[in-house]
Amino acid sequence: MTQAAQPFGVTTPSDATRGSSFSLVAQLRTNEASGADRADQIAHQLETAIAVGLIGYGEMLPAERELAAQFGVAVLTLRAALASLRDRGFIQTRRGRGGGSVVCDAGVVTETERRRRLRERSTEDLRDLGDLADSIATTAARLAAARSDHADQTRLQNLADSFRSATSPQDRRKADSRFHIGLAVAAQSNRLTTATVQVQGEMAPLLWASDPAGQLFEFEQAERDHAAILEAIVRGDETAAEAAALQHCLHETEAMINTHLDLVMGESDS
């Protein structure tokens, strides 16, 4: 069997391989950070990793020199990025012996911010994002059905269970993202894993509201979608796994576009 991909983002902070996890963070590129200076780009990459749960609450970031080397920048550039995250409450930094930067925020996007992001995106852009997401997820699901072993499938089941037991919107957002990342891990593809983290970092804050009253994607629907994907993977049915993943992504894309249109039409009526 093919060597399994390192399970980035689906392990807990206590058993994660820190170096490889932060190496993945350094590979992230997001549209929202395009055109920004390097410090702002790094800040956005770290913010994305926090948003999808790749870096967990209370986790210590690597030493500045080590982290700067991961990103291929000078320590001063990294410090500017960390200062931005610190100012916005994502991390706290303790100086001196035994100090360092610790994640102190789960990357919650407020309902006002989420609505602003959805309103400012065009229908075509949201559809394009959905197309990218479903191309990645369907490939991951198909390959997971072909390549995954019992350990991979058990990990996916645990991720699906974590989503089902999540009660807060931010926990659901992170659990949904981790399930998607878990698919890529089960597909045994590091490149798919990197691509999944990137697209989830962009989509998850648009889908999962911080206020349950503003939720645009049904929790029960996502739970059913996850179950259908997992069942097909366990059966080794590549076609069914691919189809189930496509349906899940179509549900997500439809939710984003419908909410965008409601927001735009609401503005035009006011």
Predicted features along the sequence, with ranges:
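Short leucine-rich amphipathic alpha-helices used at interfaces
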Residues: 31, 38, 44, 49, ...
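Short linear motifs at protein or domain termini
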Residues: 1-139, 263
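Short, locally clustered residues in the helix-turn-helix/winged-helix DNA-binding domain
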Residues: 51, 55, 145, 234
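C-terminal all-alpha effector/ligand-binding and dimerization domain
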Residues: 7-9, 14, 180, 201-270
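Short, flexible active-site loop motifs that bind/organize anionic cofactors or intermediates
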Residues: 56-57, 68, 119, 143, ...
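Sparse recognition of residues in long alpha-helices and their boundaries
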Residues: 66, 101, 149, 156, ...
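Conserved amphipathic alpha-helical segments that form helical-bundle/coiled-coil interaction surfaces
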Residues: 129, 133-209, 225-228, 240-254
